[in-house]
From Swiss-Prot:
GO molecular function terms listed in the Swiss-Prot or TrEMBL record: DNA-binding transcription factor activity, RNA polymerase II-specific; RNA polymerase II cis-regulatory region sequence-specific DNA binding; zinc ion binding
SMART domains registered for this protein in UniProt: ZnF_GATA
Disulfide pairings: none
Stated name of the protein: GATA zinc finger domain-containing protein 17
Gene Ontology CC terms, in alphabetical order: nucleus
């Protein structure tokens, strides 16, 4: 028997392009039905739908040809999954576009119905009867406001319930002077501020306890700088309401052995009455020496200890018989690598001695 002839290998990309050209020459276009379109947009939508259908048929035929080629030649089957994936993506896009066009076409058909010559309302429109009811309710509410300007809640309730006539109700919200004073007092009086572990408010009657509490606050502020309230101290000339409570601690620090001044000013809580309960203001000036570790100034050596170079991008330090000396960058790197090699050689010799 004779030998089986081997099939020639085809280039899949070139074959696909040639197939596309052949199909483009004689495409199987769908027959569009003759229809009297009522608008240009409706005609455009129908044309787009028919072109989508013809493109979908072309993709199906192209995929069928590629499958046949992959079955005949195994080398072409390597690119088949990628091609089928691309076909699937394009078909999904066509389906989404066709669905949107069909939805738009349905909306146009609803607007131009064949039964009546009048245009139908769109889906999002509101009923006219409901609009008239709301307008009547709003007009009645405005009329009730013009007659009885106090009964605002009644007018708003009539507008919400959409009634034709306003109801004569006498339930109105009135505010008396006592309630106003209570509200003002409750709004202006502030709660005592607690700091640290202390849970009791500041006692207004005893001044000794207040001074002790202030000293404790100063000690806590020295230990924790995050809790410091950096507000300026109160001035005697400033006019502030008696109900306000301000607690400010001004703290200034400088570097070096310089004394720091800490000023604490506290104004206690008072009521809104004209008779002010005792207000005490204490100012303690505490001076203490602050010890701040400053970075020593950078000193540049005169020259290198080995090569006597005066300028180098980076100065290094080494030891010569226990004495610290200044080295330039090149000399420092040289002796550092040399010391590293000597250390590694000593380690190797020690390992050999242990093994032997």
């Amino acid at each position: 028997m004779g030998k089986r002839k081997t099939m020639q290998s085809f280039n899949l990309e070139s074959f696909g392009k040639n197939l596309e050209k052949k199909l483009r020459r004689n495409p199987e276009q769908l027959q569009q039905p003759i229809k009297n379109y009522k608008s240009e947009r409706e005609r455009d939508i129908h044309e787009l739908i028919y072109t989508i259908k013809s493109e979908r048929m072309f993709i199906y035929k192209n995929a069928h040809r590629h499958l046949k080629l992959a079955l005949e030649n195994a080398t072409l089957a390597l690119n088949l999954p990628m091609l089928l994936k691309d076909f699937h993506v394009t078909l999904k896009e066509f389906d989404a576009l066709e669905a949107s066009l069909n939805a738009e076409l349905e909306c146009l058909e609803l607007q131009y119905s064949s039964d009546t010559s009048e245009l139908l309302l769109p889906v999002n429109s509101v009923n006219t009867s409901q609009n008239t009811i709301n307008e009547n309710a709003i007009t009645t509410a405005i009329a009730s406001l013009s007659v009885n300007p106090v009964n605002t809640s009644v007018a708003l309730s009539t507008a919400s319930t959409s009634t034709s006539t306003p109801t004569n109700t006498t339930t109105t919200t009135t505010t008396t002077s006592n309630s106003l004073t209570k509200n003002n007092n409750s709004a202006l009086v502030s709660k005592p501020k607690t700091r640290g572990v202390r849970s009791k408010p500041i006692d207004m009657n005893s001044s000794d306890d207040e001074e002790d509490d202030q000293k404790d606050d100063q000690d806590k502020d020295d230990s924790d700088e995050d809790n410091v309230d950096n507000t300026p101290p109160l001035d005697s000339n400033d006019s502030k309401p008696p109900s306000s409570k301000t607690k400010g601690i001004s703290k200034t620090k400088t570097k070096g052995n310089v004394s720091t001044a800490i000023t604490t000013t506290t104004t206690p809580i008072t009521t809104t009455d004209s008779n002010i309960i005792g207000t005490t203001t204490t100012t303690d000036d505490i001076t203490e020496e602050s010890k701040v570790k400053e970075r020593p100034p950078r000193i540049f050596p005169e020259n290198c200890y080995v090569c006597k170079v005066t300028e180098t991008p980076y100065w290094r330090r080494g030891t010569d018989n226990g004495v610290v000396v200044d080295l330039c960058n090149e000399c420092g790197l040289y002796y550092m690598n040399k010391e590293k090699k000597e250390r590694l050689s000593r380690q190797k010799h020690s390992i050999k001695n242990v093994l032997n």
